[in-house]
């Protein structure tokens, strides 16, 4: 592009007092020049037109701050990744696009207002819900740092599911579960910083990080006073999903589950009599099907328990029938040992589960062996079912208290599988162990410690700090519909006794879902207000709107895809003028309608790929709203096919480039 021409154009824009060109704008020397210009020209807004804001915006924010300007009075425009790198063969169009992008940046900057980071004090009291190995590991980790910890367990004693288990895999061997529970429980109960409440449930819980009020009920008796809690760890564990009605489970005592076998093994020794000769285990009962995936630990449990039986009774004939053997690396020694001990493994097809038949009162298991390519009949005195798991009964109650999500099996959903694997969306609440998904002993302990680490951070700092991009509610026109309260993914909006909403700014992430959905339009997002976004829309479409596609891209994934296309030098048509929003859920229907009123050839909204979203439910909210937008456009006589909605990961530059090519082709803009 012709950079000097772009700079000269910028100088001529209304309200622009100074414009300059810098080859290395992020260098120390040029950053110093920016600070000098702010002071010399008494600038009260700054627009940086260079690379992507995803990498360098914090650097320039700090620069303007050092010059005495509020960092939220900076607007960043990407003319490299969005323009010069992707339109290398058409410099004139790239130059014109750069002018438009800068004009859009200036239009928004005019309406920028000062923002500030918000701090919320956090004390040093943590509540751990659940006294299994994950909960005990978390409690010990927190208490060892000097924080007061309250551990609540609804059962009469600590240990959770381990109280029913015989052994656990550990360091290429097994350890007796009762001994593990005894050692862990002793450490917890004797720790000076841990208060243990067994036989106790949560009666009420309300508040937010640094300001939770919790009431307990112990052995049916309610506590008189509420406890002050700053952070919470949910470690409520899981339970075995009983396969009632399958393979005659529940009607024939010879059919048991792996957990019931564990209980038998707890009471067995080498001298124990076992009145069976043939044991068959069927894996993946109620798992790896249309309703749920792999249970993660079933294969390891079946192999471990088969070995335990074989060691106690070497003459036993044991068959393990499986679809796939999914075991973590550290537990593969069990598999080799089992094969060496004579335990037989038979793989059956996904669509052809083993069948149970009775011959003269004895079990016969019919199974198709994939390796042999034929059906086998295996006699059995005991049939052990490796079943799926589900969350504990308390999940519904805890979910309601904390405003968090759980799947259909009652397992809590983390904020993000990669970026927040032990976090809930709301700050100050973590989850661990089998409350999230089935896990082995080692994983549960590690996740308990990870959750402890996460909640320890704000307790050590003494506060949490939120960026200034937050929601602000003007109550003048508020209808008290509570939509913002219901839809906020982060529980950052609270209602008073009159249903009047207010924003807990330290919890708000600035996604904008509430603002876009507010029927009275009385919610503003600092730095992404309707006024600012509308100014960008109108600036983008001021000239030749019939040749332009107006795009809204989320900062986290979609813009990452745009940037990746740029870094990869993927060439696509120059028709798009993109507006950055923090989340696709921020895009209100009225901006789309306005774009078409101004004559836009098309509108594109791109959010995060499903099922992930930086703001948990943002892309789902966007999808629902865009469906409504299409219907409204159709009623207004606008072709709804001119509104494109798509989803893009941060690494998917080729996909974004293809979206642009396809859209230009369909709209006949070539």
Name each model feature, range by range.
Residues 1-548, 553-567, 571-589, 598-617, ...:
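Residues forming the flavin
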Residues 345-348, 648-670:
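C-terminal functional segments of enzyme domains
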